[in-house]
Amino acid sequence: MSDFENKNPNNVLGGHKATLHNPNVSEEAKEHSKKVLENAGEAYDESSSGKTTTDDGDKNPGNVAGGYKATLNNPKVSDEAKEHAKKKLDGLE
């Protein structure tokens, strides 16, 4: 039975990537996940921490600007975060 049978392949691969970063998972499970990712043609960088970055380089500029605009209008966001969003928006224009 395939890992992808009747499942969204991106979700399956995402689960295997998460397995590699989970400290509560056995080495055997991590090896299996690494093999699945390699067989699927997914490049895995072991130096990657799995954390997201704040680099907006590959993102849709319209979506990035929209997110910053939403931050400015959200009453639950701190003044510091709003100031940061304003600076980022000014840099996009």
Curated annotation (Swiss-Prot):
Region annotation 2 X 30 AA approximate repeats: where it falls in the sequence: 7-89
Q: Name one Pfam family in it.
A: Con-6
Spans annotated as Disordered: 1-93
Q: Which GO terms describe its biological process?
A: conidium formation; sporulation resulting in formation of a cellular spore
Q: Which domain of life is it from?
A: Eukaryota
Per UniProt, the ranges with Basic and acidic residues bias are 27-37, 77-93
Which key words tag this protein in UniProt? Answer: Conidiation, Differentiation, Repeat, Sporulation
Q: Which terms in the GO cellular component ontology are assigned?
A: cytoplasm
Q: Which InterPro entries match?
A: Conidiation-specific_6 (IPR018824), UPF0654_domain (IPR052670)
Q: Where are the sequence repeats?
A: 7-37, 59-89
Q: Which residues form a coiled coil?
A: none
Q: Which family does it belong to?
A: Belongs to the UPF0654 (con-6) family.
> What job does this protein perform?
May protect dormant spores from desiccation and play a significant role in the formation or survival of microconidia and ascospores.
The name on file for this protein is Conidiation-specific protein 6
Which organism does this sequence originate in? Neurospora crassa (strain ATCC 24698 / 74-OR23-1A / CBS 708.71 / DSM 1257 / FGSC 987)
